[in-house]
Amino acid sequence: MCGIFAYMNYRVPRTRKEIFETLIKGLQRLEYRGYDSAGVAIDGNNNEVKERHIQLVKKRGNVKALDEELYKQDSMDLKVEFETHFGIAHTRWATHGVPSAVNSHPQRSDKGNEFVVIHNGIITNYKDLRKFLESKGYEFESETDTETIAKLIKYVFDNRETEDITFSTLVERVIQQLEGAFALVFKSIHYPGEAVATRRGSPLLIGVRSKYKLSTEQIPVLYRTRNIENVKNICKTRMKRLDSSTCLHAVGNKAVEFFFASDASAIIEHTNRVIFLEDDDIAAVADGKLSIHRVKRLASDDPSRAIQTLQMELQQIMKGNFSAFMQKEIFEQPESVFNTMRGRVNFETNTVLLGGLKDHLKEIRRCRRLIVIGCGTSYHAAVATRQVLEELTELPVMVELASDFLDRNTPVFRDDVCFFISQSGETADTLLALRYCKDRRALTVGVTNTVGSSISRETDCGVHINAGPEIGVASTKAYTSQFISLVMFGLMMSEDRISLQNRRREIIHGLKSLPELIKEVLSLDEKIHDLALELYTQRSLLVMGRGYNYATCLEGALKIKEITYMHSEGILAGELKHGPLALIDKQMPVIMVIMKDPCFAKCQNALQQVTARQGRPIILCSKDDTESSKFAYKTIELPHTVDCLQGILSVIPLQLLSFHLAVLRGYDVDFPRNLAKSVTVE
């Protein structure tokens, strides 16, 4: 729930001001991950070794507040130039300790700032570690679990058995004592110009930039043979020495820059050449050379880490002419759904091929059950497509919230196929559910929007939804692309079913026209803004539908809750008389989603019950629906498409409505309170 960014310039002269600007810009790209406090750690001296110390600047509030605070530091000369320097930065979303400067990161080992660390994740055994360290005389100043890590590395250093112990060895010994999830980056006055980063269960990648030739495209992974099992024996092992053949560097020991980040969006403006770290990797940079090592060797370990090229451009993560990322992403949906289908759906032959699944297709077709697992919006995408998946695959389909799935210890078998849906590919509960299913030998399929994410790497196969970067905390275009990806899976599974060919052609024809129909829906933006003017002072809002559009109600209500802070509830129209009808009166705003599909007559029945109780329904309906409009307070008429795809068109007005409501209520659309984009802790 936090954003990590760090920058090393090796033999690349940079002023302190330029270093600040790089760090702040990196944090701004990551602000969607958390924004209740932020901080940086840089060299505080004026490039004289004898004055070496680390300067911490931390501020409660967003990254802009930190940026302003940096330039108030009279003790720091912004013009001083560093040929080699390592700076770390962090934007926080609180999990341990209230938002405050003292609880924000970087956390320090002592008042002399000998070691500082930035952290994303949760350390579950921090209380035991803190108790041990306090017994050794270490004093704590914050309420965070992260401070325990900073104090622990100081303890290891203070009790080192030799003066020439390496920075990476210290970190290796520390992480063997940590339980939970973490991505960590360390800086120390004892190791100037060096960086160490590591991860377990939380994303971390490293970008590399140099105008000179790099020594390798594959960084070999180094191993230690001995393990540390007890914190009391933490200072009794050493790591083998490195040489240039085991490291990544610029040939000739020339200039190179390294960028460490939780997310590629913070790196892409600097370089598209990145290394994705795996769980328990320890990456160290010293003298401009990057090495990677691990404590244990497993049979399944990849012997190296490849430099990968990101297929992302800076303009994709900028707002452009829109006032908010969420608004931009809503209006990108004609392109994002087209990109999801591009190269996969052949509209001439009515065939669908998902390249990431083709090697496992026979195994998937032999399964006895599909389990689709997600959280929040990703769960709603599963609900939206459950019916069409059951129809096309002729298999039972279970749709599960990841946290509940784990709480119940749900039975999973080897002949199950389990789908894991996550925009970021790092959602903690979904990732834990994936590992639960892998332990039970089920085939696992990832549906993500992030190449190199934990879910995309750990699943047996997968589908990249290709929606492009999504920065706004409230998911919009990822939902519609997840929706289409699951429909495409159903179409691929049913390709040889003769009885389903007419239905398949109907759905594929609907997919072809979808981008243009979405543009038509987006043209209703002004009308939806006018509706928001009537509703923004309300305290509650009901969204009602059934069949294919029940998921639309859940997702629309979630969007309204997320960014407007209005109470909103998605209601299955079939359950109206089992409780929700008691809420209906002339004061309660009700949005009803009624489309020309098999549930149309039943939805009409629910509509009449609402109007009979003096309700004033706002109806999302098909253009040719004259019947629903007779009972409507207001209507928003939408283009018609095949029933199983109608939910893509009907959810967009609710996305727009939530956006306009939030703006009218004076809230920050992209950064709703108490929420973060990537939920990487349970």
Swiss-Prot record:
The active site is at C2. Substrate binds at T377, S378, S422, Q423, S424, T427, H578. The keyword Phosphoprotein applies. GO terms for biological process: fructose 6-phosphate metabolic process; protein N-linked glycosylation; UDP-N-acetylglucosamine biosynthetic process; UDP-N-acetylglucosamine metabolic process. It comes from the Eukaryota. InterPro entries: GATase_2_dom, GFAT, GFAT_N, GlmS/AgaS_SIS, GlmS/FrlB_SIS, Ntn_hydrolases_N, SIS_dom, SIS_dom_sf. Residues 360-499, 531-672 form the SIS domain. CDD domains: GFAT, SIS_GlmS_GlmD_1, SIS_GlmS_GlmD_2. Pathway: Nucleotide-sugar biosynthesis; UDP-N-acetyl-alpha-D-glucosamine biosynthesis; alpha-D-glucosamine 6-phosphate from D-fructose 6-phosphate: step 1/1. The modification Phosphoserine is found at S244. One of its GO terms (molecular function) is glutamine-fructose-6-phosphate transaminase (isomerizing) activity. It is an enzyme of class 2 (transferase). Gene3D superfamilies: Glucose-6-phosphate isomerase like protein, domain 1, Glutamine Phosphoribosylpyrophosphate, subunit 1, domain 1. Residues 2-288 form the Glutamine amidotransferase type-2 domain. It catalyses: D-fructose 6-phosphate + L-glutamine = D-glucosamine 6-phosphate + L-glutamate. Keywords: Aminotransferase, Glutamine amidotransferase, Phosphoprotein, Repeat, Transferase. Its EC number is 2.6.1.16. Controls the flux of glucose into the hexosamine pathway. Most likely involved in regulating the availability of precursors for N- and O-linked glycosylation of proteins. This is Glutamine--fructose-6-phosphate aminotransferase [isomerizing] 2.
